[in-house]
């Protein structure tokens, strides 16, 4: 009697609206490529979250400050260095952050505010009119970054960006502060640094600027590098993040249907699958512009996390050798958006802000709950043909024994890729029982097709691999 191995890294089914084949992505489960028990990998629950300390409000931005060797967070109306308050931050929306030797900068409400380490707060403004230095139309700050002793910021609604003075960071450069990304007439959406370049992200192009090395007063300090220009734009100010020694970003509708790309050697390489692009396509341009991208690394996972208004998507570079590996994160037992955001390695813990409550949490690897609430984990197998076959012994390898009480796994089957039937409950975890089998002995007769869904609701970590079924 043949034994059929069933992959669980990505399920396959149909969309009931248009009958197209779609991927069923793992929910709250990460794929780990590692040879174990006749499998090429296993799936592990995303780490749980426990409360670390209270904050003033929800998370608005985070940066690791290398000058102070501390994590700076903007939560609610406050800027925090670790747990201690540093100053007040206006507004309630997302903020841009950068830091230097003498100050931590926050771009908020159209201003670049510098919180100096000596306790003073300065806002970038023009030199005094009687100084004799050029007076610039600074406008409103959209995004900020820092490179080689200077802050750089983009002017909202224009293709101009500015740099601060070397001696006094609270003023523009006294001789040549203003530069233009002339391929972006609609304005610079975001700005960043890569190696020794200033990177300006527009809606249809990404431009790079390098230092000229000029020392003459009034000479241009930066010049565009057309050989590195990328013919794609970003969807929103925070729809970009450094990733894999380059930048990952969500593209703007101006260059076609949006997707997720990684920049490499002046080219943008797509990493999104068709199912991911369908999720992204379900958002309007205005909704997409509110997206936030960030990176997270632990246990050899190189994660790119995309926070959208109704989804949190995760791309794992370490598991994508045989094709892009994506999963979905969520909170609760329904389809609530994942609450964690702004992950940062702090001390020997990974800390995170929160989208809904005024707390900072930390990831904990021996649980899968979020703030002591059970979470749902979903895995799917592909549809496969089993014409008029009888099925027995559906078995999943599970690493068990760490639960506080007996957990059950809910198994259900589909014969059309759309509707899943009644769930079969199987005990899959029990305290101190480290070799428990997860086995459904009699599945039944299959007319033509079958696929399975595995659902676990628990506070304990979940480790599953090696799904197989016996056919006759």
From Swiss-Prot:
Keywords: Late protein, Virion
Subcellular location: Virion
Highest taxon listed in the record's lineage: Viruses
Keyword Nuclease: no
Pfam families named in the record: Phage_stabilise
Cysteines joined through disulfide linkages: none
Job description of the protein: Acts as a tail hub by assembling onto the head-to-tail adapter protein gp4, generating a channel that is sealed by the tail needle protein gp26. Together with gp4 and gp26, gp10 is required for stabilization of the condensed DNA within the capsid; perhaps by plugging the hole through which the DNA enters.
Subunit structure: Monomer (in solution). Hexamer; assembles as a hexamer onto the dodecamer formed by the head-to-tail adapter gp4. Interacts with the head-to-tail adapter protein gp4; each gp10 monomer contacts 2 head-to-tail adapter protein gp4. Interacts with the tail needle protein gp26. Interacts with the tail spike protein gp9; binds six tail spike trimers.
Protein name, UniProt field: Tail hub protein gp10
Organism: Salmonella phage P22 (Bacteriophage P22)
Gene coding for it: 10
């Amino acid at each position: 009697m043949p034994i059929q191995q069933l992959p669980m890294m990505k399920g396959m089914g149909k969309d009931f609206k248009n009958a197209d084949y779609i991927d069923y992505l793992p929910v709250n489960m990460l794929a780990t490529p590692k040879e174990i028990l006749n499998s090429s990998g296993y799936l592990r629950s995303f780490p749980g979250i426990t409360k670390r300390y209270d904050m003033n409000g929800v998370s608005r931005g985070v940066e690791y400050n290398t000058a102070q060797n501390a994590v700076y967070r903007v939560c609610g109306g406050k800027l925090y260095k670790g747990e201690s308050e540093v100053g007040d931050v206006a507004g309630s929306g997302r903020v841009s952050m950068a830091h230097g030797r003498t100050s931590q900068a926050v771009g908020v409400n159209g201003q670049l505010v510098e919180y100096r380490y000596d306790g003073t707060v300065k806002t970038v403004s023009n030199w005094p009119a009687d100084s004799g230095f050029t007076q610039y139309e600074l406008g409103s700050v959209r995004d900020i970054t820092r490179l080689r002793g200077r802050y750089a910021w983009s002017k909202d609604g224009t293709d101009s960006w500015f740099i601060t003075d070397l001696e006094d960071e609270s003023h523009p450069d006294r001789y040549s502060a203003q530069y233009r990304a002339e391929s972006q007439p609609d304005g610079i959406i975001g700005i960043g640094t890569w190696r020794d370049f200033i990177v300006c992200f527009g809606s249809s192009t990404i431009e790079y600027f390098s230092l000229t090395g000029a020392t003459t007063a009034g000479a241009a300090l930066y010049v565009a590098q057309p050989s590195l220009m990328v013919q794609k734009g970003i969807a929103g100010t925070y729809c970009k993040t450094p990733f894999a020694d380059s930048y990952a970003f969500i593209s703007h509708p101006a260059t076609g249907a949006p997707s997720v790309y990684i920049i490499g050697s002046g080219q943008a390489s797509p990493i999104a699958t068709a199912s991911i692009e369908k999720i992204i396509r379900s958002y309007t341009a205005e909704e997409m512009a509110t997206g936030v991208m960030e990176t997270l690394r632990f246990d050899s996972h190189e994660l790119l996390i995309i926070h959208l208004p109704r989804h949190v998507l995760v791309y794992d570079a370490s598991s994508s050798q045989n094709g892009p590996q994506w999963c979905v994160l969520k909170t609760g037992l329904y389809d609530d958006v994942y609450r964690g955001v702004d992950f940062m390695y702090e001390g020997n813990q990974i800390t995170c802000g929160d989208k809904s409550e005024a707390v900072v949490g930390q990831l904990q690897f021996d649980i899968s709950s979020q703030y002591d609430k059970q979470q749902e984990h979903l895995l799917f197998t592909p549809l496969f043909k089993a014409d008029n076959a009888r099925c027995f012994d559906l078995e999943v390898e599970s690493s068990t024994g760490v639960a506080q009480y007996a957990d059950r796994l809910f198994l259900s089957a589909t014969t059309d890729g759309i509707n899943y039937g009644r769930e079969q409950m199987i005990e899959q975890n029990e305290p101190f029982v480290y070799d428990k089998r997860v086995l459904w002995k009699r599945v039944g007769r299959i007319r033509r097709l079958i696929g399975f869904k595995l659902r676990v609701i628990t506070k304990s970590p979940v480790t599953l691999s090696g799904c197989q079924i016996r056919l006759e």
